[in-house]
Amino acid sequence: MQPESGANGTVIAEFILLGLLEAPGLQPVVFVLFLFAYLVTVGGNLSILAAVLVEPELHTPMYFFLGNLSVLDVGCISVTVPSMLSRLLSRKRAVPCGACLTQLFFFHLFVGVDCFLLIAMAYDRFLAICRPLTYSTRMSQTVQRMLVAASWACAFTNALTHTVAMSTLNFCGPNVINHFYCDLPQLCQLSCSSTQLSELLLFAVGFIMAGTSMALIVISYIHVAAAVLRIRSVEGRKKAFSTCGSHLTVVAIFYGSGIFNYMRLGSTKLSDKDKAVGIFNTVINPMLNPIIYSFRNPDVQSAIWRMLTGRRSLA
């Protein structure tokens, strides 16, 4: 690493990412596992996206949001895993500060859109189950696009706030990050300037973002649960609970790992637990989402099968 001179002393030009494991003998195993996870995640999500685009019977609001979620999952894992695999191959751990902040921005952009999209999906289920007579008008294509556009706009603002807050900090050594990608807790820990204001800002933004999202999702599903319990058909009740259960599972995993990550802001000592949470955020979540949401869904399964075999739906 070549430090460069700044107005406030020596300012580091790059960070050293230690990765998941420091044992050289285990690096090939890590490479194969993460390459496999990456290919499975990208392949699964792109298959769902293609099915949603091609199959007429999947041209509904629920699958429109699932298609967008698939794009986000591919983006989220592509921000972190390919660069980690590249470092494993080249055995170079140095990452320029600019590249680190860029990774931070895009990671929080995709995760932020995911967060807001989960609200839209909960709202969609609320309308479909609790307001079925007005569902088609309240969840029109225009409304769907507006919800997705609003999700991107809010997430962009959130990611930009995080990135600007980190860019104002001074990093003058040490520059070793015990992680496999750049994220907030690790950068805050390495800063040689006061991080109190930045941490308060990030806590406030994170609390508003996560708190509002969770409150809206919980309120939606309280109404959904009450409506489902009033359904007389056992089959209809089972189908509704299956769809909502998949969404709630993803919500629990997503917010659970995200809240833990934010709670690590201000921590003076970061451990391997943070790497485990990082794996959940960047690899496990994007890989599980297609399985939880769609591969359990017979409509999606049959749509993907028809697409792979060259048969088209007549719907």
Swiss-Prot record:
PROSITE patterns: G_PROTEIN_RECEP_F1_1, G_PROTEIN_RECEP_F1_2. Disulfide bonds join C100-C192. Its main location: membrane. Residues 53-60, 124-143, 224-240, 296-315 are cytoplasmic. The keyword Disulfide bond applies. Signal peptide: none annotated. Gene3D superfamilies: Rhodopsin 7-helix transmembrane proteins. It is found in: Cell membrane. Glycans are attached at N8. Residues 1-28, 83-103, 162-199, 265-275 are extracellular. One of its GO terms (molecular function) is olfactory receptor activity. One of its GO terms (cellular component) is plasma membrane. The chain crosses the membrane at residues 29-52, 61-82, 104-123, 144-161, 200-223, 241-264, 276-295. Keywords: Cell membrane, Disulfide bond, G-protein coupled receptor, Glycoprotein, Membrane, Olfaction, Receptor, Sensory transduction, Transducer, Transmembrane, Transmembrane helix. It is a multi-pass membrane protein. It comes from the Eukaryota. Odorant receptor. Belongs to the G-protein coupled receptor 1 family. This is Olfactory receptor 3A1. It comes from Gorilla gorilla gorilla.
